[in-house]
């Protein structure tokens, strides 16, 4: 990049605009825009905003036109000796070169600062990415383990559901059986309750054949022997019934059969004999 392609910028730190029109040039080789130059150099003594140098000389601050007219360029150096013209030109070129060099240093400093900041941010983000990757790997492992646990629970739930359904079917079956037996017992009990209490049918007792319609009347039971004999006979109690079967222990369902219930009712009304 040639020097002519570079544009001078205002050396005021907060400004940094490209200069055009008029500018304020200082003896310490700094240049400012017309706005900040007129504002900063109106105080006495004037101090350079860029390097804080005191500008007390008459020509330490010059307001110059950056694009002079052709008439001005034709007359400003007229009559000067060549060495003076060259000296003025060399100083003007040195000022321009200094400004361009300082601007490049400033841009390189900003670039280096931004690059360092970018590296720090990149390093920080890489650390965060690594940390997040570790967390992500850990979470993936946890998800896999939780999926395995979930599958195990699903399998257990399915097995338990099948067992529960089987238990429900067994319960419904047993409940139906219980209801039918209960209804049957209620029907038998109601039929037996309708029989006459004084007349009890006997079957196969004291030599009477089964199906015999003879009935014992409780009013004709003999009390004792009135005529006397070798021995005095007195009726002793005994039960004319079948022996009662022992009740089953620890049985889930125990139902009495109808014949057993009828036999128990007959036993409750059995004859009692007394031997004298």
From Swiss-Prot:
The keyword Transferase applies. One of its GO terms (biological process) is reciprocal meiotic recombination. The keyword Ubl conjugation applies. It is found in: Nucleus; Chromosome. GO terms for molecular function: identical protein binding; ubiquitin protein ligase activity; ubiquitin-protein transferase activity; zinc ion binding. One of its GO terms (cellular component) is synaptonemal complex. It comes from the Eukaryota. It catalyses: S-ubiquitinyl-[E2 ubiquitin-conjugating enzyme]-L-cysteine + [acceptor protein]-L-lysine = [E2 ubiquitin-conjugating enzyme]-L-cysteine + N(6)-ubiquitinyl-[acceptor protein]-L-lysine. Disruption phenotype: Both male and female mice are sterile. Males do not make sperm and have much smaller testes, a characteristic of mutants with meiotic defects. Early stages of meiosis occur normally and full synapsis of homologous chromosomes (homologs) is achieved. However, crossover-specific recombination complexes do not assemble and crossing-overs fail. In spermatocytes, chromosomes fail to congress properly at the metaphase plate, leading to arrest and apoptosis before the first meiotic division. Pathway: Protein modification; protein ubiquitination. A zinc finger (RING-type) spans 10-52. Ubiquitinated; autoubiquitinated. Interacts with CCNB1, UBE2L3 and NF2. Ubiquitin E3 ligase that acts as a limiting factor for crossing-over during meiosis: required during zygonema to limit the colocalization of RNF212 with MutS-gamma-associated recombination sites and thereby establish early differentiation of crossover and non-crossover sites. Later, it is directed by MutL-gamma to stably accumulate at designated crossover sites. Probably promotes the dissociation of RNF212 and MutS-gamma to allow the progression of recombination and the implementation of the final steps of crossing over. This is E3 ubiquitin-protein ligase CCNB1IP1. It comes from Mus musculus. The lineage of its organism: Eukaryota, Metazoa, Chordata, Craniata, Vertebrata. The gene is Ccnb1ip1.
